[in-house]
Amino acid sequence: MDPVDVVGLARTLIDIESTTGQEGPVARVLAEYLRGRGYSVLEQPVAGDRINVIAAVGEPSLVFSTHFDCVPPFFPSRVADGVLYGRGACDAKGILAAQVAAAERLRAAGETRIGLVFVAGEERGSDGAKAANTIASQSKFLINGEPTELKLGKATRGCFRVRLTAHGKAAHSGYPALGESAIEKLIDVLASLRAAAWPSDPELGTTHYTVGLIKGGVAPNVIPPHAEAEVFFRTVGDHDALRHTLAATVAGRVEVDEILELPSVRLHTVPGFETEVFAYFSDVPFLSNWGTPLLLGPGTIHVAHTDHEHVVIADLERAVDLYADLAASLLRG
């Protein structure tokens, strides 16, 4: 059995555009590649021309998993000075190639209890992972791939997104006493958020947030009757504590509408790996049928989604070693 050319496979995948919602072409190429290496492959429909690629040679006790959708804009691969560039180089087509290479190394050594679960849609809604989770599995472990700088994830933070809406009364700006500024009310509330004591966890740290969107007003010479902001919390622990703090902080001055809620996730770790808490989210919560989760991958999240996304080739090759060794250790028990 020929070893996988991890850089070559990564470049093949990177060079097929697969912006979220357009994953069909790359999925079919991947499925055919795995069939050519002797895998039994399921092309699981997700929606429209979107499919997951689920592969194995036996009954898996452990699966490698990551996603092959990417954020826009697409740009093709190139290699320079020992670095692989391209959309998806680190998030997550390079990771996918390393996982395939690790699975093939294990298979060459006689280990056939490895499965592959590669999904669409991680970047927006985790549609592929949700579809994959409808499949019954006997897998005991899930090694999910995201750019972790080759550290094992100890946990990922949760998400809690809200819209804050302030209401006022329109009036001529020359007579402010006749109106009530919704923008000023909203500014006061946002200032209060900065002073609040948000929930914390000894291992995961303190909840933090970003005010990502602000809208309000109708004209410079009109007292604004309406203003709103969207606030995105990266959370730790139980969200009820966050809700309580938020309600006490806004104190009825604005309306609070919840838009998105995803829990923080604690992950399995093993001795010998550096660990870290990651502020981003992953497909892990939506793949609960596939075993106890671990999170590991080459590359850094700090260049994912950028116009210079890349992964160091030495790290990509090191990831193959780590994936194979980690899987073998877990399967030995």
Spell out what each predicted region is:
Residues 1, 18, 42, 153-154, ...:
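Metal-dependent amide/peptide-bond hydrolase catalytic core
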Residues 1-89, 111, 295:
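Acidic/His- and Gly-rich active-site-bordering loop/insert found
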Residues 24-28, 96, 243-244:
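Short, surface-exposed alpha-helical segments at coil->helix boundaries
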Residues 62-64, 143, 169:
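Residue-level marker for buried hydrophobic side chains located in beta-strands
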Residues 64, 82-125, 164-166, 176-196, ...:
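Alpha-helical metal-binding/catalytic segments enriched in His/Glu/Asp
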Residues 97-161, 201-202:
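Acidic/histidine-rich catalytic neighborhood of metal-dependent amide-processing enzymes
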